[in-house]
Amino acid sequence: METSSIEINELPLATKTQTPPASVEPIPMETSSIDELPSSDSNATDNIEAVGEKRKRADEDEKTNLESSDTKITTPSPWWKTSLCSYFRREASCSHGNECKYAHGEAELRMKPDNTWDPTSERGKKAKAMKMSEHEEKEEDEVLFTEQMMESIDGDEGGGGSVSVVDLSLSKCLVHLPNKWQSDELKKFLGEQGVLYKSAKKRRGMIVGFVTFENAEQLQSGVEILDGKTVNSSNLKIADVLPRTFDKNDARKSVKSARDAVTPLAYLSYADQLEQKKTSIGQMLKKLARNARKACPNGNSLPQWVLTSRDRGGLACNLEGIIESPITNGYRNKCEFSVGLSLQGKPTVGFSLGSFCAGVTAVEEPVDCPNVSKIASQYASIFQKFIENSKFQVWNRFQHSGFWRQLTVREGRKPGVFSNDEDAITRIAEVMLMVQVCLTGSDEAEVATEFEELAKAFAEGARASSPTLPLTVLVVQNHSGISNVAPPDAPLQVLAIPISDNGTDQEQTTNVLTEARIHDHINNLRFSISPTAFFQVNTVTAEKLYSIAGDWADLGPDTLLFDVCCGTGTIGLTLAHRVGMVIGIEMNASAVADAERNATINGISNCKFICSKAEDVMSSLLKQYLDVTQMEEAKPLSNANDDLNKQIPSTEEMTNSEHVADQNLPPSNTQVEELQDNEQKDSSSLEPEKTTKPQFKNVVAIVDPPRSGLHPAVIKALRTHPRLKRLVYISCNPETLVANAIELCTPSFDEPDRGNKNYRGRKKIGIAALARHRAKSMPTSEAFRPVKAMAVDLFPHTDHCEMVMLLER
């Protein structure tokens, strides 16, 4: 539980009182006995000293505002004495004396109106510890290892790949070990603790280790010694090893299912899911206000939005509510199924039951996963039946070997309004299948034959289903990395799909550049999607999200819109009819090609897409399209264009020409500068009026970054450009939105601090704390302020939620 940012109104001196509200019972001294409470939690008392200085400035600002008001407050706030005074805690005294609105010690502390205690207080820490203890008791006491992991680690250590026989009844897993440890470090630790054992195995990068004992006496003694032992500030947990020959009727069954792993909120009603997500977003807004208060420079007044956050219950801005998804079941248009072994050791296509880092290796079929469409689930079943009889092995994540790795199913729907979940499924018109394999060490001829059989299996399975499953394109992706997340340039191969025609077999060949794609629709626009391009997984709800973003951006014909991290151009293209010009930035060349193709398909001519990392070009683009507009119109632009074209490489220069369709775009009436080749730049026949920059009165940026958030260079470019007054931030990870907003909204320091070079090396530092540190080095510039926020449920049944926030200055 985090330190509360909720404060009460400072009372005018003439009306202050020490008498608590009559409705609140005094707290007996016995309930706050320090001896009975656990030791201090360092996480709960984060930056206590910094809070005092910020609160002092807040008090001074509030006091000034209240002294100028004629209104007198005669009743103490319900938050009176509900938080501990940081001055009193540190100095054993406070300048406010008995009139301080904060509690001077545990005896004065009152319970908050929401029936919680100050998290930095002893009672708050005790409540947190009890809650964590209850949570740990509910956790599984088994680790979903299979013998595959034990054999892999054993083979690695043996050097020759030999496998020893392991008695699982005499084996235990040690959870919460340092992930940098290997078997030698684990054995050394066991020896230091005086633990006798038969074998001990540990792989770097995992937090679990595997220990086998000689007999039951050794096992019992080892458990007594190790259970709860502290290692690097973490408490060890002893867990049983779940054998892959696990009997589903076993009385020990308490295994998390694929449904629980993928859709953890599916057990709740949808209304309860929405309420839980709205509350979670509210906590993020409180976190933003709390961290902004800490980040503000000493000696400066806090921003008004921080001071008024207490009037909103601690929220940095108003939370407008949550937008629900029109469809809640089978809504995902992209599903990535892992290939591995089930608990029974059978090759399985489905979802992993947990984190690989935590030692979870089992894969379960996507049965009863409400976010997966029936079509995707059927294709997973078809693929599983095929690999069960394949001569090639499934991927072994421990030995980094094998052939079959992953199946991705992408779906494209017809346009229209979806009235229910079933209607959304029946509108699926196109399907792309992408099978990820590792070709390392495989015979080329055998692979070619296997791929032919694979295409035949998918085609026959699709035709045998009732109704027939759509199958538009089949792609194979070659990837040999450790993780299944392949780089954007991983080799792709389109397979011919055999089709049946009047009893004869014919082959339909496809072209990798023109046919390896499907189409979907958003706001009646048709979008072309390549195998690896990003596209919102819930297009129906994405329409609502983009509509909100456009409304909040206050768009108009004189607006220049920057679509940062634009993907296939969905945001910019859906809003293009409302603005003068759209500049999209995306690092994925395939997605940029799709964006340009999508503009052509829909006849949109006022969009330009740049293929590059946003942090590399954002600053130059802002100068190119904004700074030049302030120059005198009479000034020749040919030289300026030459310089700017040198700064910003064209799409063709940054990608292979076969992936880019920019040259096919119709000419734009508002596009101010084409990314020209050298001959065009040197031509003297250009008419001056065609190269003149339009005067955009309104400049807006909409950012939709990946879960990692915006790069610091992008944040700096957005923050320091004076022409950019409005920013709409769309985030699938509210945690990173908060971190980025801290840098965007914190007032500038009088003298920017270059910071401690070793700051990144601090252990267990949160992204919010790192953002506060980076804010110190932000160049002097006007800060944004959060205006309003909205939650949008793009992912029903999961604990993820999209968040959109409007920032202005």
Swiss-Prot record:
Active-site residues from the entry: 732 (nucleophile)
Domain of life: Eukaryota
Matching CDD domains: AdoMet_MTases, RRM_AtRDRP1_like
Record-linked InterPro entries: Methyltranfer_dom, MeTrfase_TrmA_AS, Nucleotide-bd_a/b_plait_sf, RBD_domain_sf, SAM-dependent_MTases_sf, TRM2_met, U5_MeTrfase_fam, Znf_CCCH
Zinc found in the keyword field: yes
Sequence positions bearing N-acetylmethionine: 1
Keywords, in A-Z order: Acetylation, DNA-binding, Metal-binding, Methyltransferase, S-adenosyl-L-methionine, Transferase, Zinc, Zinc-finger
UniProt region (Disordered), positions on chain: 1-74, 652-693
Matching PANTHER family: TRNA (URACIL-5-)-METHYLTRANSFERASE, TRNA (URACIL-5-)-METHYLTRANSFERASE HOMOLOG A
Identification of the protein by name: Zinc finger CCCH domain-containing protein 24
Organism encoding this protein: Arabidopsis thaliana (Mouse-ear cress)
